[in-house]
């Protein structure tokens, strides 16, 4: 995590010797001490002093000095207002936040123009479409440290209109943070150093802005009140969000900070969702990385499972699809609902045989705008004219989509019911906004003709301007006899009559000189001056009228925000379902079948990403394989050569399980799947130098986490465990870990190993079997067949793989000789340690003389004298004299 910001105290009062403008700047900057302040001056946003130096370094812009204030040079840097989004994007990517300060007053000539900060752009509260990724959310996360090793989480995307709440143990915090993937994190100044260190140690990619907020902002009572106000409700019970004090405390800070950055209340946030860890299939950080769900191991966006799945037509569809992939639920209800919808989209309406309806829907979705984000920008009054036009065009499409989905499966019918926005909304947009508006309201030309009579009248004056000037020019040429006389206009000098220097002596007395040029003179007449006043006044009044009308349109649109939010969700859901339908047909995937009993049964399973890459590169066909696992067969010991496909086979099973759990068809010819609560992976590792952890330490940490967390309903992938240490240590650990997984955890386990000794494991463990990746030798070459076959591998083919890698012949020859010698020694020494034998029983020592004597006594038959003699005898035995 980077770019820590703390809530600093305000600077001391501005010295009186500062200029009025700099005094204004320092007054504004005092409210944003840890944020870059973009201070609007004409056509530029200026930064001063430390902000200027930082911006110049980060943006590679020019740092200058201009004049003095309070006896010090004014250090400054600036960016043009028309390209500010480019610079904001670069700063946000670096984890910085920017306060945008605009001129809100009129130029009066008496002191500086009134300015105020209208919004704060931070990595976790982005709303500008230019700054946001189409396929990812900008998440703001608030974390509150609670009592007894607990914490509360609250997070939101300002463009989504929904607050998420969760409470968890501190030990689970890192996994929650990874799942949320925030762009910005805020936490309390009262957080303990240990908790803060754990939070900062969460495995996050890229720059994450971290802000420390005052402790009083994390108040559970305040949080509950804020949530109720957002929901306009008297109780949180309908959302099952009551009795979550730690999450409520985080929500108080979250909503307060989000409102602070936007400069207003977030009226569009009208939903709360509580997330509980036991509702989701656990996908730890290692699983997300090893399965390359959204990023490759090299940190690239493709080829990944998500990039293969995502053929969505809209950004909001892509984001929803990613959410389904990364947050599969243990309850199969939603997944089955999606599978039913995909089947219906494939086959169409049974009554009309509309096969291929998904193609029609995708064609209608094509070109749709991001309704979700535009709706948020309407609520925040930040929406631009062209975004409203795009929204209006998309709302027209919803009528077609509603008609196309009519009569389909129940879930699709429910979606269809939310697709239509109120007619009044689409009508308002069509009437109010010009079909080809300017980019910004301040440029004019935004409100449609016919919407407002006063605006039309003012525009008519401007429209008639050209005709008036042409008529005046004809009349003045006739009156003066100056053939090359021109009547013109520019923004600097307004309207004027231009006459060349050679014709100046012909101008009438009512011409008043306005400007002298090298080859011409410019004049104005009383008639032209009167028209100028009228025309320029009309232009200013028209622009002011447009701005006012645009604000009125935004006011009227506020009532439609909840309906537009539902439309956005329905469009995104339909888009994501159509994308999954297209993938299922194009890639020849099948519908998985969910069963209640423990079962992982895959016929002709394939790794979809690897198969797609092979198809792209013409590297041959992917070899499909079966997998059968259940109560009597929960572990596979997988052996075979490197490059043979062990890891691909293991990963494809995990990917198929994940795809089924999210509600997608799967790359197989058949799939039956029982309950799954987690997918754990231990595949590969690299030294973590930053945290001083070796490959082997990471390997053991990951294995330990799996042994602690896995259950009988978990899928566990173990690849080459124990290879990071000596052979005997590694073998001993691998066998013990396998035993624990088999006997205690009883998870579905795929255990790939190079330790041939582990192939003896199934002989003593009833629910384990040996399988191997097949290969064939052709002379000294090896041919990988990539088929999973029963039984252990016969050999490892390591030298053949080294030959394929280009190892020098001399090295290979020596390796063959060494291998032959080692195999000969192994044959001579047949005695082996039984790795899987039960722990030896404790040896029982022979009874001592005292124990024998005591055992021979019968106290009930002894007289007092005999008992006394026996006691003396035992004493002699104890002293060793007997």
Swiss-Prot record:
Keywords: ATP-binding, DNA damage, DNA repair, DNA-binding, Nucleotide-binding. It holds the Pfam family MutS_I. GO terms for cellular component: cytosol. This protein is involved in the repair of mismatches in DNA. It is possible that it carries out the mismatch recognition step. This protein has a weak ATPase activity. Belongs to the DNA mismatch repair MutS family. HAMAP family: MutS. This is DNA mismatch repair protein MutS. It comes from Albidiferax ferrireducens (strain ATCC BAA-621 / DSM 15236 / T118). The gene is mutS.
């Amino acid at each position: 995590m980077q770019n820590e910001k703390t809530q600093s105290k305000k600077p001391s009062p501005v010295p009186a010797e500062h200029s009025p403008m700099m005094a204004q700047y320092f007054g504004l900057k005092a409210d944003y001490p840890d944020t870059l302040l973009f201070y609007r001056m004409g056509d530029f946003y200026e930064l001063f002093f430390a902000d200027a130096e930082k911006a110049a370094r980060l943006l590679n812009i020019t740092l200058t000095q201009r004049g003095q204030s309070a006896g010090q040079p004014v250090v400054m840097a600036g960016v043009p207002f028309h390209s500010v989004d480019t610079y904001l994007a670069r700063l946000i990517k670096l984890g910085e936040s920017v306060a945008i300060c605009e001129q809100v007053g009129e130029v009066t000539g008496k002191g500086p123009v009134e300015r105020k900060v209208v919004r704060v752009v931070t990595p976790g509260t982005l709303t500008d479409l230019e700054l946001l990724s189409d396929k990812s959310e900008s998440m703001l996360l608030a974390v509150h440290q609670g009592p007894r090793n607990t914490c509360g989480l609250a997070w939101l995307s300002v463009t989504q209109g929904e607050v998420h709440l969760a409470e968890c143990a501190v030990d689970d915090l890192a996994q929650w943070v990874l799942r949320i993937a925030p762009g910005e994190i805020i936490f309390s100044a009262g957080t303990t150093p240990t908790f803060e260190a754990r939070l900062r140690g969460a495995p996050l990619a890229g720059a994450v802005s971290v802000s420390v907020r005052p402790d009083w902002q994390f108040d559970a009572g305040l949080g509950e009140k804020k949530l109720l106000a957002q929901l306009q409700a008297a109780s949180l019970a309908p959302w099952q969000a009551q009795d979550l004090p730690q999450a409520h405390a985080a929500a108080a800070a979250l909503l307060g900070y989000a409102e602070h950055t936007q400069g207003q209340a977030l009226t569009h946030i009208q939903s709360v969702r509580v997330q509980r860890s036991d509702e989701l299939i656990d996908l730890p950080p290692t699983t997300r990385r090893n399965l390359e769900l959204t990023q490759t191991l090299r940190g690239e966006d493709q080829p990944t499972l998500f990039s293969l799945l995502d053929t969505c037509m809209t950004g909001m569809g892509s984001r929803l699809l990613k959410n389904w992939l990364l947050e599969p639920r243990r309850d199969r209800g939603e997944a089955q609902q999606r599978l039913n919808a995909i089947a219906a989209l494939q086959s169409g309406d049974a009554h009309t045989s509309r096969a291929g309806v998904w193609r029609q829907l995708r064609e209608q979705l094509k070109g749709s705008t991001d309704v979700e984000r535009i709706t948020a920008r309407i609520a925040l009054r930040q929406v631009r004219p062209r975004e409203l036009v795009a929204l209006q065009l998309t709302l027209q499409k919803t009528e077609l989509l509603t008609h196309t989905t009519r009569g389909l499966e129940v879930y699709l019918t429910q979606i269809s019911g939310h697709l239509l926005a109120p007619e009044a909304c689409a009508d308002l947009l069509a009437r109010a906004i010009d079909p080809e508006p300017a980019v910004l309201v301040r440029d004019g030309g935004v409100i449609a003709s016919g919407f407002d009579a006063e605006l039309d009248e003012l525009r008519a004056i401007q429209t008639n301007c050209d005709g008036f000037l042409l008529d005046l020019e004809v009349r003045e040429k006739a009156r003066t006899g100056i053939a090359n006389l021109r009547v013109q206009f520019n923004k600097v000098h307004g309207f004027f009559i231009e006459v060349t220097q050679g014709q100046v002596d012909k101008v009438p007395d009512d011409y008043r000189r306005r400007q002298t040029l090298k080859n011409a003179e410019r004049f104005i007449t009383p008639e032209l001056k009167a028209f100028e006043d009228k025309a320029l006044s009309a232009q200013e009044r028209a622009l002011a009228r447009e701005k006012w009308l645009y604000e009125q349109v935004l006011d009227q649109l506020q009532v439609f925000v909840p309906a537009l939010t539902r439309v956005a969700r329905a469009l995104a859901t339909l888009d994501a379902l159509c994308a999954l339908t297209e993938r299922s047909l194009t890639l020849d995937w099948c519908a998985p079948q969910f069963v209640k009993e423990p079962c992982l049964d895959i016929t002709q399973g394939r790794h979809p990403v690897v198969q797609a890459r092979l198809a792209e590169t013409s590297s041959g066909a992917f070899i499909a394989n079966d997998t059968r696992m259940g109560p009597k067969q929960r572990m596979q010991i997988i052996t075979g050569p490197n490059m043979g496909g062990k890891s691909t086979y293991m990963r494809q099973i995990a990917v198929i399980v994940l795809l089924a759990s999210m509600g997608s068809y799967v790359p197989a010819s058949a799939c039956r799947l029982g309950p799954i609560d987690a997918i754990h992976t231990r595949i590969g590792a690299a030294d973590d130098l930053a945290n001083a952890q070796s490959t082997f330490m990471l390997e053991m940490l990951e294995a330990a986490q799996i042994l602690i967390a896995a259950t009988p309903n978990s899928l566990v992938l173990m690849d080459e465990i124990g290879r990071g240490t000596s052979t005997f240590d590694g073998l001993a650990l691998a066998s013990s870990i396998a035993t624990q997984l088999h006997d205690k955890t009883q998870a579905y386990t795929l255990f790939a190993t190079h330790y041939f000794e582990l192939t003896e494991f199934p002989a003593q463990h009833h629910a384990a079997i040996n399988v191997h990746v097949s290969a064939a030798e052709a002379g000294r070459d090896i041919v990988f067949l990539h088929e999973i076959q029963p039984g252990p591998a016969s050999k490892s083919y390591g030298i053949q793989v080294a030959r394929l890698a280009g190892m020098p012949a001399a090295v290979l020859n020596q390796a063959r000789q060494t291998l032959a010698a080692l195999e000969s020694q192994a044959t001579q020494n047949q005695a082996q340690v039984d790795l899987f034998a039960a722990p030896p029983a404790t040896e029982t020592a022979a009874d001592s003389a005292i124990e024998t004597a005591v055992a021979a006594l019968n106290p009930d038959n002894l007289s007092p004298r005999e008992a006394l003699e026996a006691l003396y005898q035992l004493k002699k035995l104890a002293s060793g004299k007997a």
